[in-house]
Amino acid sequence: MSQTEPTSTGRLGIAAAPAGLRLVQDLLNTRDVGGKVPDLLASTDSAGDWLIAELARHPAETSGGVDRFDPTEADLDDLRALRREVSALLHGEDVAPREPAVSASLVITPGGDVRLAPAGTGPQRFSSAIWAEVFLAQQNDTWRRLKLCRNAPCSSAFYDRSKNNSGVWHDVKVCGNAVNLRASRARRRAGGTLPGEGQPR
Protein backbone atom coordinates (compact mmCIF):
# COMPACT_ATOMS: atom_id res chain seq x y z
CA MET A 1 0.00 0.00 0.00
CA SER A 2 1.51 3.32 -1.04
CA GLN A 3 0.72 6.81 0.21
CA THR A 4 -1.41 7.39 -2.89
CA GLU A 5 -3.59 4.33 -2.33
CA PRO A 6 -6.75 4.55 -0.20
CA THR A 7 -6.30 4.31 3.54
CA SER A 8 -8.13 1.65 5.52
CA THR A 9 -10.77 4.29 6.20
CA GLY A 10 -10.83 5.56 2.62
CA ARG A 11 -11.54 2.09 1.23
CA LEU A 12 -14.80 2.16 3.19
CA GLY A 13 -15.84 5.50 1.72
CA ILE A 14 -15.69 7.16 5.15
CA ALA A 15 -14.36 10.68 5.69
CA ALA A 16 -11.10 10.88 7.62
CA ALA A 17 -10.90 12.25 11.14
CA PRO A 18 -8.95 15.50 11.51
CA ALA A 19 -5.19 15.72 12.04
CA GLY A 20 -3.47 12.81 13.78
CA LEU A 21 -6.71 11.28 15.04
CA ARG A 22 -7.02 9.87 11.53
CA LEU A 23 -4.22 7.45 12.44
CA VAL A 24 -6.34 5.97 15.24
CA GLN A 25 -9.37 5.80 12.94
CA ASP A 26 -7.32 3.99 10.30
CA LEU A 27 -6.14 1.39 12.82
CA LEU A 28 -9.73 0.62 13.82
CA ASN A 29 -10.78 0.36 10.18
CA THR A 30 -8.18 -2.27 9.30
CA ARG A 31 -10.64 -4.96 10.35
CA ASP A 32 -12.78 -7.04 8.04
CA VAL A 33 -16.08 -5.19 7.71
CA GLY A 34 -18.91 -7.61 6.98
CA GLY A 35 -16.76 -9.60 4.56
CA LYS A 36 -16.66 -6.65 2.16
CA VAL A 37 -13.01 -5.73 2.73
CA PRO A 38 -10.12 -7.85 4.04
CA ASP A 39 -8.51 -7.53 7.45
CA LEU A 40 -5.27 -5.63 6.81
CA LEU A 41 -3.74 -7.19 9.92
CA ALA A 42 -4.43 -10.73 8.73
CA SER A 43 -0.91 -11.37 7.43
CA THR A 44 2.60 -10.05 7.97
CA ASP A 45 2.80 -8.86 4.35
CA SER A 46 -0.40 -6.80 4.37
CA ALA A 47 0.31 -5.45 7.85
CA GLY A 48 3.84 -4.40 6.91
CA ASP A 49 2.71 -2.55 3.79
CA TRP A 50 -0.11 -0.85 5.68
CA LEU A 51 2.10 0.23 8.60
CA ILE A 52 4.71 1.82 6.36
CA ALA A 53 2.06 3.81 4.49
CA GLU A 54 0.37 4.90 7.72
CA LEU A 55 3.51 6.08 9.48
CA ALA A 56 4.61 7.93 6.35
CA ARG A 57 1.28 9.81 6.40
CA HIS A 58 1.57 10.66 10.08
CA PRO A 59 2.35 14.37 10.76
CA ALA A 60 5.40 13.62 12.90
CA GLU A 61 6.88 11.44 10.15
CA THR A 62 6.44 13.53 7.03
CA SER A 63 9.93 15.04 7.04
CA GLY A 64 11.99 11.86 7.29
CA GLY A 65 9.76 8.98 6.30
CA VAL A 66 10.03 5.44 7.68
CA ASP A 67 12.15 2.56 6.44
CA ARG A 68 10.32 -0.62 5.49
CA PHE A 69 10.35 -3.41 8.04
CA ASP A 70 8.96 -6.91 8.19
CA PRO A 71 6.59 -7.49 11.14
CA THR A 72 6.65 -10.91 12.75
CA GLU A 73 3.68 -13.02 13.83
CA ALA A 74 4.27 -11.73 17.37
CA ASP A 75 4.07 -8.17 16.03
CA LEU A 76 0.73 -9.03 14.41
CA ASP A 77 -0.61 -10.25 17.75
CA ASP A 78 0.47 -6.96 19.34
CA LEU A 79 -1.15 -4.87 16.58
CA ARG A 80 -4.43 -6.76 16.82
CA ALA A 81 -4.34 -6.38 20.61
CA LEU A 82 -3.77 -2.64 20.17
CA ARG A 83 -6.79 -2.47 17.87
CA ARG A 84 -8.94 -4.30 20.43
CA GLU A 85 -7.74 -2.00 23.22
CA VAL A 86 -8.59 1.19 21.34
CA SER A 87 -11.95 -0.26 20.32
CA ALA A 88 -12.73 -1.14 23.93
CA LEU A 89 -11.78 2.39 24.95
CA LEU A 90 -14.30 3.82 22.48
CA HIS A 91 -16.94 1.46 23.86
CA GLY A 92 -16.29 2.86 27.34
CA GLU A 93 -14.94 -0.46 28.60
CA ASP A 94 -12.06 -0.97 31.01
CA VAL A 95 -8.78 -1.37 29.16
CA ALA A 96 -5.83 -3.47 30.31
CA PRO A 97 -3.22 -2.74 27.63
CA ARG A 98 -0.34 -5.13 27.03
CA GLU A 99 1.98 -2.14 27.43
CA PRO A 100 0.67 0.05 30.29
CA ALA A 101 3.52 2.53 29.69
CA VAL A 102 4.38 3.71 26.17
CA SER A 103 7.24 6.08 25.31
CA ALA A 104 6.91 9.21 23.18
CA SER A 105 9.07 12.29 22.64
CA LEU A 106 8.53 16.03 22.67
CA VAL A 107 10.07 17.48 19.51
CA ILE A 108 10.71 21.18 18.93
CA THR A 109 10.49 22.20 15.27
CA PRO A 110 12.63 24.96 13.69
CA GLY A 111 9.51 27.12 13.70
CA GLY A 112 9.15 26.77 17.46
CA ASP A 113 6.24 24.31 17.49
CA VAL A 114 6.36 21.53 20.07
CA ARG A 115 5.07 18.17 18.89
CA LEU A 116 4.46 14.87 20.62
CA ALA A 117 6.33 12.39 18.43
CA PRO A 118 6.22 8.57 18.53
CA ALA A 119 9.24 6.65 19.83
CA GLY A 120 10.67 3.24 19.02
CA THR A 121 10.71 1.31 15.75
CA GLY A 122 8.25 -0.72 13.70
CA PRO A 123 5.06 -1.77 15.49
CA GLN A 124 6.35 -0.24 18.75
CA ARG A 125 6.60 3.13 17.03
CA PHE A 126 3.09 2.70 15.69
CA SER A 127 1.74 1.87 19.15
CA SER A 128 3.47 4.98 20.51
CA ALA A 129 1.90 7.09 17.75
CA ILE A 130 -1.58 5.69 18.44
CA TRP A 131 -1.52 6.40 22.17
CA ALA A 132 0.02 9.82 21.60
CA GLU A 133 -2.87 10.72 19.30
CA VAL A 134 -5.42 9.37 21.78
CA PHE A 135 -3.83 11.54 24.47
CA LEU A 136 -3.89 14.66 22.27
CA ALA A 137 -7.51 14.03 21.25
CA GLN A 138 -8.54 13.63 24.88
CA GLN A 139 -6.80 16.90 25.73
CA ASN A 140 -8.42 18.92 22.92
CA ASP A 141 -11.86 17.30 23.37
CA THR A 142 -12.07 15.63 19.96
CA TRP A 143 -11.79 12.08 21.31
CA ARG A 144 -15.52 11.94 22.09
CA ARG A 145 -16.25 12.49 18.40
CA LEU A 146 -14.44 9.37 17.24
CA LYS A 147 -17.04 6.59 17.33
CA LEU A 148 -17.80 3.08 16.15
CA CYS A 149 -20.87 2.63 13.97
CA ARG A 150 -23.75 1.26 16.05
CA ASN A 151 -24.60 -1.24 13.31
CA ALA A 152 -22.74 -4.23 14.82
CA PRO A 153 -21.88 -5.99 11.52
CA CYS A 154 -20.25 -2.73 10.42
CA SER A 155 -18.66 -1.14 13.52
CA SER A 156 -16.61 1.15 11.27
CA ALA A 157 -14.79 4.01 12.97
CA PHE A 158 -16.07 7.45 11.97
CA TYR A 159 -15.65 11.03 13.14
CA ASP A 160 -18.92 12.61 14.22
CA ARG A 161 -19.08 16.14 12.81
CA SER A 162 -22.65 16.85 13.93
CA LYS A 163 -23.06 20.00 16.04
CA ASN A 164 -24.44 18.14 19.05
CA ASN A 165 -22.22 15.07 18.61
CA SER A 166 -25.29 12.84 18.28
CA GLY A 167 -24.24 10.63 15.36
CA VAL A 168 -24.34 6.86 15.89
CA TRP A 169 -24.02 5.55 12.30
CA HIS A 170 -21.09 6.01 9.95
CA ASP A 171 -23.75 6.50 7.25
CA VAL A 172 -27.41 6.97 8.16
CA LYS A 173 -28.66 5.75 4.78
CA VAL A 174 -26.52 2.62 4.79
CA CYS A 175 -26.38 1.46 8.40
CA GLY A 176 -29.10 3.55 10.04
CA ASN A 177 -31.77 2.34 7.64
CA ALA A 178 -30.58 -1.27 7.89
CA VAL A 179 -30.76 -1.30 11.69
CA ASN A 180 -34.12 0.47 11.75
CA LEU A 181 -35.51 -2.05 9.25
CA ARG A 182 -34.32 -4.99 11.37
CA ALA A 183 -35.84 -3.41 14.48
CA SER A 184 -39.13 -2.81 12.68
CA ARG A 185 -39.24 -6.43 11.49
CA ALA A 186 -38.50 -7.67 15.00
CA ARG A 187 -41.35 -5.59 16.45
CA ARG A 188 -43.75 -6.90 13.82
CA ARG A 189 -42.76 -10.48 14.50
CA ALA A 190 -43.25 -9.92 18.22
CA GLY A 191 -46.75 -8.63 17.53
CA GLY A 192 -47.72 -11.21 14.93
CA THR A 193 -46.73 -11.86 11.35
CA LEU A 194 -45.04 -9.62 8.87
CA PRO A 195 -47.07 -8.35 5.91
CA GLY A 196 -47.34 -11.17 3.40
CA GLU A 197 -46.41 -13.85 5.93
CA GLY A 198 -48.88 -16.48 7.07
CA GLN A 199 -51.29 -15.66 4.24
CA PRO A 200 -52.80 -18.33 1.97
CA ARG A 201 -50.87 -18.90 -1.26
Where are these regions (language model features)?
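Residues immediately within or flanking Cys/His clusters that coordinate Zn2+
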Residues: 146-151, 167, 172, 178
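Short helix-coil boundary/hinge micro-motifs
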Residues: 1-148, 152-159, 193-201
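Short linker/helix segments within small regulatory modules
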Residues: 160-167
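Basic DNA-binding region of bZIP-type proteins
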Residues: 165, 173-192
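Short, cationic motifs built from Arg/Lys/His that form the positively charged side of catalytic pockets
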Residues: 80-83, 87, 167-168, 178, ...
